[in-house]
Amino acid sequence: MLSWMDCAFSNDGKIIFAAAVVIDTSDFSIIETTTASRKVDFPYIPGLLSFREAPACIDAVEKLKTNPDVFVVDGQGIAHPRRLGIASHIGLLIDKPTIGCAKSRLIGTFDEPGSKKGSHNPLMDSGEKIGEVLRTRTDVKPVYVSVGHKCTLDDAISIVLECTTKYRLPEPSRLAHQLVGQAKLG
């Protein structure tokens, strides 16, 4: 079982909504979903986004009745200036394996991966490998995968690819995004 998490803010930015979708990776069936919302109590500071988003994600995780093997977060793991993005932050707090899968690069340099699905190249920062730039669909922009907590980069890449069917973003990511959007609308 795998859980994917996503967040969204109210239009005025005062409330944060989080969603966790637990799926069976063998058939992508939804096992459980939870949502949470709370007042935003930390200002926007670049590089410290997890202090704004992680509390709501933890609230959603704590509502789960199932116990997923791994949590994937829409955001960075160690591919972060402080090597502690939201996926790492949440992993430390829940003491579970976490993976960061982001739509955009926060830091680092890379050579563009090949155009075929599954192609990937290292994401580097100051000589350190901090993640992989992974093509999840042929001829489509890549995603940025990094270790969050208690997992290997190879496992993170495999999990993200396994969950990617017909779109750029892995299917559980799309489900979590839809769920948090519904929670935001009330």
State the predicted function of each range:
Residues 7-13:
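Short acidic, Gly/Ser-rich segments with clustered Asp/Glu that frequently serve as metal-coordination loops
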Residues 97-102:
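Short hydrophobic alpha-helical runs that function as membrane-insertion/retention elements
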Residues 58-90, 94-96:
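Catalytic-site beta-strand/loop segments enriched in glycine and acidic/polar residues
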